[in-house]
């Protein structure tokens, strides 16, 4: 990533906005890590389950993701994603199924156990986001404000 110099000096309000936004993100991340840990999941395992369930698939009849797609969604290397999928399979949270369109490829699909865990986790995460909505809305509104 290349950093571009600011065309105008940043104001103290800009730094405050960035600090507040980073704090809100970290607060949510800490909540998420704790919620996953309560169900004996690492944050990366939780993110993987959510990616499999929540990523729009093409064609739409696909039930899972390929390992490479998981790597892309989690911003990790494919071999790291493959190891992660292996650990999730040993925990009976995912299964590997032949792609119905291309038998050489394998889709990673959630098990019923994972579906139940993910539903509980996702419900609590949505509740937390709803609780944070006023703060997030204020921060996002401030991003749209003209510099002071």
Language-model regions, residue ranges each:
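Charged, amphipathic alpha-helical coiled-coil/dimerization segments
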Residues: 4-5, 85-144
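N-terminal leader segment of winged-helix/HTH proteins
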Residues: 1-39, 91-93, 138
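N-terminal helix-turn-helix DNA-binding core of bacterial DNA-binding proteins
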Residues: 30-77
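Pre-recognition alpha-helix immediately N-terminal to the DNA-recognition helix
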Residues: 16, 20, 27, 47-54, ...
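Residue-level marker of regulatory loop/turn positions in helix-turn-helix DNA-binding domains and
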Residues: 10-13, 41, 59, 110
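Amphipathic, non-transmembrane alpha-helical scaffold segments
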Residues: 22-25, 74, 118, 122
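Short, charged, intrinsically disordered terminal tails
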Residues: 61-64, 141-148
């Amino acid at each position: 990533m290349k950093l571009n110099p600011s065309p105008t000096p940043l104001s103290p309000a800009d730094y405050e906005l960035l600090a507040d936004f980073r704090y809100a993100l970290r607060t949510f991340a800490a909540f998420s890590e704790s919620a996953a840990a309560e169900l004996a999941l690492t944050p990366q395992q939780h993110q993987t389950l959510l990616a499999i369930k929540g990523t729009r698939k093409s064609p739409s009849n696909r039930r899972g993701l390929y390992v490479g797609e998981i790597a892309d969604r989690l911003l990790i290397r494919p071999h790291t994603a493959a190891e992660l999928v292996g650990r999730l399979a040993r925990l009976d949270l995912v299964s590997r199924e032949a792609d119905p369109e291309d038998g050489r490829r394998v889709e990673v699909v959630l098990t019923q156990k994972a579906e139940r865990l993910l539903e509980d986790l996702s419900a609590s995460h949505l509740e937390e986001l709803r609780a944070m909505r006023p703060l997030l809305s204020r921060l996002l509104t401030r991003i749209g404000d003209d510099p002071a």
